[in-house]
């Protein structure tokens, strides 16, 4: 992993974060199957290998970060040699002592080098310092790299939300207890 620093975002960071490649490439997706019978409702997610890799667009407009970053409970930025290379946007629900990782982005050339892991661990530390009990990680069902990362870091599948994103993609939520 390159030498990185993770710190809270400041205003000049935002324009650079918007410019990062927010999309991902994948050979797999999680496919949802619904089975509704009398007295029974069953949802199943299956890992499906695609016939060829697809480029998955980010489910939100990257430009929305410009308006939303100050409304977020926290935005943590990863930098390398003074350049912004990734970020995570956090939403805190103090009532239930939970933090949701709403966005996690690492610029394409630096992916698969541990930066996403470092951002999630920094988000976990941020949540613990604020006395939260649970960390939840949100992602589209097509973002297979994020799904694998969630499992690798000990998150468990919690819930889904159909047509959650502006592009109508399914959101998956993985969570883990902090204390």
Predicted regions and their residues:
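Conserved acetyl-CoA-binding loop-helix of GNAT-fold acetyltransferases
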Residues: 106, 112-125, 148-152
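Extreme N-terminal starter segment of soluble prokaryotic enzymes
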Residues: 2-5
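Conserved catalytic-core motifs of GNAT/GCN5-like acyltransferases
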Residues: 138-139, 151-171
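Acetyl-CoA-dependent GNAT
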Residues: 19-102, 107-108, 121, 161-163, ...
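Conserved beta-strand-loop-alpha-helix junction that forms the acyl-donor binding cleft
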Residues: 106, 111, 137-147, 164-167
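Conserved GNAT acetyl-CoA-binding A-motif
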Residues: 127-138
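Short alpha-helical
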Residues: 12-15, 96, 144-145
